[in-house]
């Protein structure tokens, strides 16, 4: 199969997250398209716990990492807001679960390191309207988040 269009990759990631939530007895409901802050509302079956989840998906033919809007670096101060980074692979998918502000700090840290490093010719880098986050920047803490759905607090 050829390269999937970005919108198909994104929607597929949202459905994959909903499916994983369902396997854990958590109801995942997609929000209307273009909701700016989150894609899924997840709730326990008894309705006692609910969280909002933004989903970012990277397909298996992507070798640059997750492309995020620069607004990801704006903290939301909401303990019930999460981001799931989906690494969509041919057979098995990986899900990296973050509280929103934790990912916000990580992405800001990675971007600040990037922007403070001059280009090969010595000139400074210019600010861009997106942020990349990929495996080469992962710490041991990032790897502990793989398929760690307990971070959402439903356990």
Q: Over which residues does each language-model region extend?
A:
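Mixed-charge (Asp/Glu-Lys/Arg
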Residues: 1-36, 41-155
